[in-house]
């Protein structure tokens, strides 16, 4: 935008066809839209009156969210979001929830214990659900769209606590939440091949083609839950040679595994039927060693995390001593698509020390910023 008289520019926008105006604004980075609302009352009215986008814009890649939790003083909690279009970190309001059992997915934060609740990411407004049949901490969680185009939430795995201890014998049932009926449905737990009591510290998941895939880092077992029949597939093994740990993602129409293989961080595309894998990218060495301390022990890479969606895969270190350095890989389209890596800027100072970091990536819509009260579980989510 130019530095001309804002009233003239507003008048110019008003003379445009409404569809053209909306198309232009939908393609702007959200931080730019927020700044433009300060130009004049006309601009603010124009931008805040935009209808919700029916689906994520191709020019709106997923943001990376980091929620730092301090276990003795919520005053030290901090929240950040990285917008790849503007290449900037934004400070967010810290979570107002009293629970530190947070999970993030699909533009929402969720508390899973002692009561289940959810809130839009950008402007906290917590809402409780009906009681969960089997409360749990650290479950796998995502929102999916049903064949009737409604949205539901699925909980898989996690740990239950009895007297502060984990019940290692219990295999928690899958639970599916219907936000319209405010009700939970019980389904079969993870296949018996997966150890009981596992959570997102050992399991990783991805929503892909109407199936919820779960991968176990210890056994390298993988299985998928059909979101139509509510049944589990046969358990298969997924282990590229030399793999030490990995994270499952759904990116660019592919099932993507990202993890450490020896002393390199690789990305593989996964064929969902056979679980055959093919390498699509390797992180440049200078970026990889910029994420860890060179004088660490052999497990120095263990604090690396990976989260991907759309055409981006984020890799970051959730060790507070490193202040959460990160990089991002853009996955090219097509069979011969070129993947490009770049470093993510440092978090804005000051950055506190946290006992727990909740991290995930998600698209962000105009509704999330200007009309969070209208945000709904599953809005603009495509399974």
Swiss-Prot record:
Signal peptide span: none
Gene Ontology CC: cytoplasm
SUPFAM superfamilies: F-box domain, Kelch motif
Pfam families: F-box (PF00646)
Kelch repeats: 63-109, 158-205, 253-308
Domain F-box: 10-66
Keyword Iron: no
Keywords, in A-Z order: Kelch repeat, Repeat
Domain of life: Eukaryota
InterPro entries: F-box-like_dom_sf (IPR036047), F-box_dom (IPR001810), Kelch-typ_b-propeller (IPR015915)
Lineage: Eukaryota, Viridiplantae, Streptophyta, Embryophyta, Tracheophyta
Stated name of the protein: F-box/kelch-repeat protein At3g24760
